[in-house]
Design a protein with these regions (language model features):
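Core transmembrane alpha-helical segments of multi-pass membrane transporters/permeases
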Residues: 1-23, 38-50, 54
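Alpha-helical membrane-interface segments at transmembrane helix boundaries
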Residues: 2, 28-36, 116-120
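Residue-level signal for the membrane-embedded core of alpha-helical transmembrane segments
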Residues: 5-9, 60-63, 84, 98
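Helix-coil boundary and interhelical linker segments in multi-pass alpha-helical membrane proteins
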Residues: 22, 26, 32, 70-82, ...
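Lipid-exposed faces of alpha-helical membrane segments in multi-pass integral membrane proteins
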Residues: 43, 47-50, 69, 128, ...
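Transmembrane helix boundary and interhelical junction motifs in multipass membrane proteins
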Residues: 56-67, 99-103
Length: 144
């Protein structure tokens, strides 16, 4: 329980620091002309997936990009439900595709196999889910 509380505390401190620096406003101002609401959820999914894969942390990634992508999505007119779905889906994909994430290590240990073997056996399913998620976010972003 202590690691979760520590992460929450660090998240609030990071949010306060970013707010005082005006980081969110700066990012929104610089990227708004380049983004379209129809493809924004797919972009958020891809960003979340890459960050969660490289860091191995689903919740850490979510706490970093959520304060940035929600104001940005609001400014460009993207659907907030799709944005949250993209953040959660990207984090889940990245966490399960990562070779050293907690989800991979726990699943491999509970099955009694090597973590790399488990990760490689999951990779084709993760890639299929990733492609379907990107297509789904593109379609729903265009419709909603």
């Amino acid at each position: 329980m202590l690691p979760v509380l520590t992460m929450l505390l660090v998240t609030f401190v990071l949010k306060d620091i970013c707010g005082r620096m005006g980081m969110t406003d700066y990012i929104v101002e610089k990227t708004e002309p380049l983004l379209f609401p129809a493809i924004f959820p797919a972009m958020v999914f891809a960003l979340g997936a890459v960050l969660a894969f490289t860091t191995g942390s689903d919740w850490g990634m979510s706490s970093i990009i959520t304060p940035i992508v929600f104001p940005l999505g609001s400014v460009i007119g993207a659907n907030p439900v799709l944005i949250m779905a993209a953040v959660i889906s990207g984090g889940t994909f990245g966490s399960h595709a990562c070779f050293y994430s907690d989800a991979t290590l726990l699943a491999a240990q509970s099955a009694g196999i090597d973590s790399m073997e488990h990760a490689l056996s999951q990779l084709p399913y993760n890639v299929i889910a990733c492609v379907l998620a990107v297509v789904g976010f593109m379609l729903t972003g265009a419709v909603m």
